[in-house]
């Protein structure tokens, strides 16, 4: 209730054992009119046994390895971590890996090599986020811990395409929005797009695209401040506040203007825009547009009855 009153973005539920635990929390949030997403902290044997059922009703998961290692055998925890990450990726739901990531930095200014590898492997496995706890809550080197983890993540992501694990299988595409998200990933690759740009109110489209791990950034345009904050947790997504109306042309114009103004891609780059009709309705995504970002300096009539574009060159001399 406190979280609902203070407009929090996520509620992490501890010691989840079954899906009914999540349903009860959601009832409380809905009764309070809150839009917060629910993260299930996977830290009990029962939660692992009921993984699929819990995943159906939750918005994301956290692999809380500290308590999980107490309830289960130590040697089982690494594979459970990988299994939870994979299941979350298959459902397009964010997953956080937490606890003892850089534990030695509670006392020391540098992590062990094993801890560095632990962070890197969570990134390679496909986690949406890695989280510090004791290192920043009560450690001697909180700022250094954040800086160190950031460096490990950035370095790992430079070569992550070479080593990242792909899910053994993705679920069959059965919804229009999901199929469009899958297609957007492929189209972006074919046209060498600089970004995929979903127009989304709830954030659902951005999460669906993220599930397929495109090779370019996902610049999510949303009019909702809460959605903007929530999407900051999702893999590969850079959320932006952008006016989205029920008029598709106006919404596209707003998105492109923001991209140009903030220099989010280079002039001449292709972007893949995802939208749907009616705009603003969750799950309505059904269109893909490939647009080249450029400044229009002239317009004319095409004799071939289709849109044509070209690169304008400025001559500094007659030669």
Residues of each region from the PLM?
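Non-catalytic helical/linker scaffolds that mediate oligomerization, partner binding
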Residues: 1-306, 313
